[in-house]
UniProtKB/Swiss-Prot annotation:
It is an enzyme of class 1 (oxidoreductase). This is Enoyl-[acyl-carrier-protein] reductase [NADH] 1. Keywords: Cell inner membrane, Cell membrane, Fatty acid biosynthesis, Fatty acid metabolism, Lipid biosynthesis, Lipid metabolism, Membrane, NAD, Oxidoreductase. The lineage of its organism: Bacteria, Pseudomonadati, Pseudomonadota, Alphaproteobacteria, Hyphomicrobiales. It comes from Rhizobium meliloti (strain 1021). It catalyses: a 2,3-saturated acyl-[ACP] + NAD(+) = a (2E)-enoyl-[ACP] + NADH + H(+). It comes from the Bacteria. Belongs to the short-chain dehydrogenases/reductases (SDR) family. FabI subfamily. One of its GO terms (biological process) is fatty acid biosynthetic process. One of its GO terms (molecular function) is enoyl-[acyl-carrier-protein] reductase (NADH) activity.
Length: 272
């Protein structure tokens, strides 16, 4: 995105949730770095660290530390590391979610209490916990961004409790936007269309969902991590200085559609 060169010069922030070079979070990290931002990345566990380290090197990013959002001490440690390195930060990207994939099939009615609580803790509460710590080290006028999905608004196959969690996450965006607005800190979410990522591998019949979106979205295609990254760049930069509490859709317009397109072919379920 050459026209964005220099847009984030002098801005510093952390991206939490990069898993590999197909992650939506990675698309965001690249867009920010190309626009001049200084980036920090986190990881969870040694396996992910091995994947994230070469990506950090590619962008010249700071490795801010291991972060398991179920352990608040690790979130504290990450923000302490950021404060020690930079003093203040300007943006945070939260790209963290989890649910037992075995409970994403079948009926939502059968969701276990344990998985419901764990899904909400990791996918929803962690955003509030991260925002609370960001508030302490963020410059006035900063920006916080999280990732959601259309399953928060409408029932989607094989999404179950994650849809409930994303709905709660979107509500959290609005409440946090009010809490932080007096400092000029903006809080928003991107609702991306389906993209082949590590997280998406846990969703059943995902190839079918991709094709359905491709055939029925107004733009007649799915979206890329680069397109999500460019939208994130807008929301994290001063270009969106008047925008907060929003869910910004990057889904080729699929969220506007009420029924199958009349010219869309009939497709059977494509097994992953």
């Amino acid at each position: 995105m050459a026209q964005a060169s220099g847009l984030m010069n002098g801005k510093r922030g952390v991206i939490m949730g990069v898993a590999n070079n197909r992650s939506i979070a990675w698309g965001i990290a690249k867009a920010l770095a190309e626009a001049g931002a200084e980036i920090a990345l986190t990881w969870q566990g040694d396996a992910l660290k091995k994947r994230v380290e070469p990506l950090a090197q590619e962008l010249g990013a700071f490795m801010a530390g291991h972060c398991d959002v179920t352990d608040l001490a690790t979130i504290d440690a990450v923000f302490s590391a950021l404060e020690e390195k930079w003093g203040k930060i300007d943006f945070v990207v939260h790209a963290i979610a989890f649910s037992d994939k075995d409970e994403l099939t079948g009926r939502y009615l059968d969701t276990s209490r344990d998985n419901f609580a764990r899904t909400m803790d990791i996918s929803v509460y962690s955003f509030t916990a991260v925002a609370a710590r960001a508030d302490r080290v963020m410059n006035d006028g900063g920006s916080i961004l999280t990732l959601t999905y259309y399953g928060a608004e409408k029932v989607m196959p094989h999404y179950n409790v994650m849809g409930v969690a994303k709905a709660a996450l979107e509500a959290s965006v609005r409440y946090l936007a009010v809490d932080l607005g007096n400092r000029g800190i903006r809080v928003n979410a991107i609702s991306a269309g389906p993209i082949k990522t590590l997280a998406a591998s846990g969703i059943g019949d995902f190839r079918y969902i991709l094709k359905w979106n491709e055939y029925n979205a107004p733009l007649k295609r799915t979206v890329s991590i680069e397109e999500v990254g460019n939208s994130a760049l807008y929301l994290l930069s001063d270009l969106s200085s008047g925008v907060t509490g929003e869910v910004h859709h990057v889904d080729s317009g699929y969220h506007t559609v009420g029924m199958k397109a009349v010219d869309a072919p009939d497709i059977s379920v494509l097994k992953d």
